[in-house]
Design a protein with these regions (language model features):
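Active-site hotspot residues in diverse enzymes, especially metal/ion-binding acidic/histidine motifs
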Residues: 1-147
């Protein structure tokens, strides 16, 4: 199975951080390893190396953390001075990053019975997030098979 540039990036990131199984995927551990400070508030945003996560369920907070880390690792610049289309692009990229960061392909491939429930339980994400990530994974497999 081929990996996209983003999947390679996340695979290498996790290998560098010695993260190799879903039980290691936690905000506290990854924040420490990535040297970012995490705070909780009414909205999610990134300010330098400080990640503010909107208070919510554990699953939603993990997903928001993935989104903000996407900005932290992959984007530079101030949203206030950017064109709306570029902001939208960066938000789309951060969303896509979150799906792969929270449910890395190299770990997903190790799940025995891949379905929405097992993804949700294994990676501690909510149902919709798991459903979307499963769709992404299935589309990738379908594309790879040439059908």
């Amino acid at each position: 199975l081929f990996y996209s540039h983003l999947e390679d990036y996340i695979n290498n990131l996790y290998k560098t951080l010695s993260i190799n199984n879903p039980k290691q995927l936690s905000i506290a551990l990854l924040a420490k390893k990535l040297d970012v400070e995490v705070y909780y508030g009414n909205v999610s945003f990134l300010f330098g190396d400080k990640v503010v996560i909107k208070r919510s369920t554990k699953q939603q907070e993990w997903q928001e953390f993935g989104h903000e880390i996407g900005h932290y690792l992959r984007h530079v610049g101030n949203h206030l001075s950017m064109n709306t289309l570029f902001i939208n692009l960066q938000e789309y990229q951060a969303d896509n990053f979150a799906y792969h960061f929270c449910i890395p392909t190299f770990m997903l491939q190790e799940v025995k019975d891949i379905n929405i429930y097992t993804i949700s339980e294994t990676f501690d994400v909510d149902y919709e997030f798991a459903r979307h990530r499963l769709d992404m994974h299935n589309n990738k497999l379908l594309f790879a098979s040439g059908k």
